[in-house]
C-alpha cells in the first residue's frame, strides 16, 4: 500500500520460514511509524553545519535552544537527529548509508564544498556505485547510487 513517501508491503511468502519473523508477533510485521538515526556529536554546531550546509540535508525540526540544541534532518524515508553533546566520537564502526540519484554529480558537489573523500566512487561487486566520506566526528558515510539495471530497482 502506498502512503506517499513510504511504501508499506505485506511480508513476503518466504517470511513464514524465517526464524526471526517470530519475534514480530502474530501480526507479521512491526508497525513502524517513523525512524531516525540518533547521533550525539562532540561539537553540535560543527556537525549541524556539516549536515545542513555541506551535505545539504533539509531540516525537519529543531528543539531546545543554544549551541547544544537538537536538530532533526530529513534523511530519505527516515530522519537523522543530532542531539546532546558527546565526550568522544561515536564508535568507529558507526556508518550512514545515503542513496543519491547520481553519484558523479554528488561527488562533484561535495568536492566543490571541500569534503574530503575517503574513497572515490567505485562499482562494487554487488553492483552498487559507492563512495565514502566522513562527518566531523569521523562517522563514515557511504553515498550510493543504485544503477538502473540493479535488482534493487526492479518492481516485479
Could you describe each region identified by the protein language model?
Residues 88, 125, 146-150:
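A short acidic/small-residue loop/turn micro-motif
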Residues 1-11:
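Extreme N-terminal basic, low-complexity initiation segments
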Residues 31, 38-80:
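Core segments of cupin and vicinal oxygen chelate
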Residues 10-13, 29:
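Ala/Thr-enriched low-complexity intrinsically disordered regions
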Residues 17-48, 94-96, 147-156:
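N-terminal beta-strand motif that seeds the catalytic metal site of vicinal oxygen chelate
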Residues 33-42, 71-74, 87-113, 129-134, ...:
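Vicinal oxygen chelate
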